[in-house]
Swiss-Prot record:
Complex and partners: Part of the 30S ribosomal subunit. Forms a bridge to the 50S subunit in the 70S ribosome, contacting the 23S rRNA.
GO MF assignments: rRNA binding; structural constituent of ribosome
Protein name, UniProt field: Small ribosomal subunit protein uS15
Biological role: One of the primary rRNA binding proteins, it binds directly to 16S rRNA where it helps nucleate assembly of the platform of the 30S subunit by binding and bridging several RNA helices of the 16S rRNA. Forms an intersubunit bridge (bridge B4) with the 23S rRNA of the 50S subunit in the ribosome.
Species assigned in the record: Mesomycoplasma flocculare
NCBIfam families to which the protein is assigned, alphabetical: S15_bact (TIGR00952)
Keyword RNA-binding (UniProt): yes
Length: 88
């Protein structure tokens, strides 16, 4: 899980204010840290199928949000993927 301080920092960085938590860029930016922690978990626990389901759900959610952002606001999409170092 993300700490409250880290979460607040991500929200202000991508949402432009503390209260803008529903912005697509903010929602996308909050997912990579959880995904990375789960990757490390699966290196140690290869047979944990229940957590794998949650991991796949998070990856798919990020994928759907990125596709939505790409269709609606391509400039914001480019900024987000460059800031998070995801995709090409």
């Amino acid at each position: 899980m993300i700490t409250k301080a880290k979460k607040a920092e991500i929200i202000t960085r991508f949402g432009k204010s503390e209260k803008n938590t529903g912005d697509i860029s903010v929602q996308i930016a909050l997912l990579p840290e959880d995904i990375e922690k789960l990757k490390l978990h699966f290196e140690k626990n290869k047979k944990d199928k229940h957590s794998m389901r949650g991991f796949i759900a998070k990856v798919n959610k990020r994928k759907k949000l990125l596709n939505y952002l790409k269709e609606k606001n391509f400039a914001s999409y480019k900024e987000t993927i460059e800031a998070l170092n995801i995709r090409k």
